[in-house]
Design a protein with these regions (language model features):
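A membrane-topology feature that recognizes alpha-helical transmembrane segments
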Residues: 1-180
Length: 180
């Protein structure tokens, strides 16, 4: 992997990530045109730069990223836009840096959630429900789901797209630091 490749991806990804962050913060939605378009662009850039091996690398990284958010998506703790954005960023990052990328995104997600909890911008009802669904076999899931604020309520959702963007930038910066 060359230094030019990392700089190219950083320059290419930055405006796209800023656009998705703004969309997620304002409307708590990540548009399909941005997420699926980003996934296609990531695979195209990987294959254009590295050929078939790059395409395979990007595709595997995207699949691992989808698998990473699959359980949170299934228990409704993450949205489909988050899954698609993570897959797109994984396609750009590539297989080699995927573990670092997923750890950076997780840590950034924790920081964003704590920040929003401290500023009282988000409620803990969804988080409590998710943990009780996972770890408490006696928990009444129907009653718990009824206590969660509606999905369109601003306080019910954390803009995880911001955490994905921060984790992507952190991974690219780590990659740049390792090359110098």
């Amino acid at each position: 992997m060359s230094l030019t490749w990392t700089i190219f991806r950083t320059i290419l990804l930055t405006p796209w990530l800023i656009w998705l962050c703004r969309s997620d913060v304002k409307s708590r939605r990540l548009p399909n045109a941005g997420t699926l378009g980003g996934l296609a662009a990531g695979l195209l850039v990987q294959s254009g730069w590295w050929g078939w091996s790059g395409l395979k690398d990007g595709l595997l990284a995207a699949c691992i990223a989808v698998g990473f958010l699959l359980i949170p998506f299934l228990i409704r703790a993450a949205g489909a836009g988050d899954v698609k954005m993570l897959a797109a960023c994984g396609a750009f990052i590539g297989l080699r840096w995927t573990p670092v990328f997923l750890m950076a995104v997780s840590f950034a997600g924790l920081l964003v959630a704590v920040w929003m909890l401290c500023r009282r911008q988000v409620t803990t009802a969804r988080l409590k429900h998710a943990f009780r669904c996972l770890f408490d076999w006696r928990y009444d899931r129907k009653a718990g789901r009824a206590a969660i604020p509606a999905k369109d309520d601003e306080r019910a959702r954390v803009p995880f797209g911001v955490a994905i963007a921060i984790g992507t930038w952190a991974t690219l910066l780590a990659e740049l630091a390792m090359k110098n």
